[in-house]
Amino acid sequence: MDADEFRRLGHALVDWIAEYRERLESLPVMSTVRPGEIRARFPAEPPRQGGKLAEAVASLDELVLPGITHWNHPSFFAYFPSNTSYASVLGDLASSGLGAQGMSWQTSPAATEVEEVVMEWLRRMVGLPETFTGVIHDSASTATLTALLCARERASGHGQNRAGLQGGEPALTVYASDQAHSSVEKGALLAGFGKAHLRLLGTDAEHALRLDLLEAAVEEDRARGLRPCALVATTGTTGTAALDPVEGMAALAERHGMWLHVDAALAGTAMVLPECRWMWRGVERADSLV
């Protein structure tokens, strides 16, 4: 593909996206195809010659769109809000067009420093103190895993880093409510804590973590010779948008020398409004936040 064809197909694809968005409301929210139906529309063998990108763009309506669940549909209310705007589509285009890898300052200084600017803007927008900074992760799940890894290393004095899971030290434990997002359990497993050392505790009538159950679980684990390591407080659970008592959990974490991670992936954006910040009162005492 040369630059002229790129321009032509790019304009065609932008037009297709705009037209799709304009008629989105008239489409069914969920796809009505059966399992395997989309796959059956494609040939079994790969094409012997490439370069038929114009045909690929033209086939989006016929081959792809029937199998799409329309996450940007005004009647889509499942999972997390994930709507993309025209501006974000253009941002993806610019990022792909530059093709820069931003894993370090040297590989792309602008990527590193723009990320710092964006995180500083976000910090100010949600009213976090100057002690906070951040990085952009590919997902909230990855961010929670990173937080649990940091908690593990702090609690073990980097012993897990050196000796791994076979170091022979007493097991570390993690605590969250039974309403916490599945990424907490997955993160605990990937970080090596194991299901046996993850405590998913009961909630009150508002579906928020009960501090009395948390305190009892921590004390019981200490008595058994285990090492309480991390708490995960949720600001906006996936099921009911419940709010865990961040301030009370922060006090408990400080008392027991534990890492406090706040999962605000669902309701965190509401903190742009000062009148909503009571929802995560005490967040400034957290060790990490997503």
Language model segments and positions:
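A structural signal for alpha-helical segments
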Residues: 1, 5, 106, 135-138, ...
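N-terminal entrance/gating region of PLP-dependent enzymes' catalytic architecture
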Residues: 1-131
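Residues in well-ordered beta-strands of folded domains
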Residues: 78-80, 95, 135, 175, ...
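Peripheral, non-catalytic segments flanking oxidoreductase cores
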Residues: 84, 101-108, 112, 124-141, ...
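Conserved PLP-enzyme active-site core in the AAT-like
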Residues: 139, 143-290
